[in-house]
């Protein structure tokens, strides 16, 4: 989650990133300032930053997989710590749609939607960690990045 913000800041500074796999990235998703600010059902202004369109466009050239585990609400629960993740998942989906609209290749996976239940914020410590690694490996293979 903490690595997400570092990734979003690094992409505009280099052309050496071949792909991004982000497990429950936290704050700082970059949105283009030539579009309206993203709005979710969850109040969280830390989840995104507005950037110039030419900065945002760099993300369209990098295949990206974003994965979120279980226990993330789809509507506000009144618990700010839990709701924060609902907003982040919604922001990731909005971000993916905007990047893809500009020619990008972003996939957002919410594991329960694929039938995986019980995954925490630390998928490589979960009992199905081999399945999680396989999910990531298969995506890398589909993108020709498994060499």
Segments the model singles out, each with a brief description of its role:
Residues 27-107:
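The feature captures the conserved acid-bearing segment of alpha/beta-hydrolase catalytic domains
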Residues 118, 122-147:
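Catalytic active-site module of serine/aspartate enzymes centered on a nucleophile-bearing elbow/loop
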Residues 109-118:
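Short glycine-rich catalytic loops that host catalytic nucleophiles or stabilize transition states
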Residues 15-32:
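A conserved short beta-strand
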Residues 4-15:
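Short glycine-enriched nucleophile-adjacent loop
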Residues 1:
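Alpha/beta-hydrolase fold nucleophile elbow
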Residues 24, 68, 112:
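Residues at the C-termini of beta-strands that transition into short coil/loop
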